[in-house]
Amino acid sequence: GYFLFRPRN
């Protein structure tokens, strides 16, 4: 979802 905060999401 939020690659800015969660690289795997």
Swiss-Prot record:
Functionally, this protein is described as follows: Stimulates uterine smooth muscle contraction and causes selective vasoconstriction.
Q: Which PROSITE patterns match?
A: NMU (PS00967)
The entry's family comment says: Belongs to the NmU family.
| Single GO MF descriptor | hormone activity
What is the annotated localization of this protein? Secreted
Its GO biological process terms?
Answer: regulation of smooth muscle contraction
**Residues the record lists as Asparagine amide modifications:** 9
In which organism is this protein found? Cavia porcellus
Answer yes or no on keyword Secreted.
yes
Gene (name only): NMU
Secreted in keyword set: yes
Checking InterPro entries in the record gives: Neuromedin-U_amidation-site (IPR018070), NMU_C (IPR008200)
Q: Which GO terms describe its cellular component?
A: extracellular region
Name under which the protein is recorded: Neuromedin-U-9
Could you tell me the keywords of this UniProt record? Amidation, Hormone, Secreted
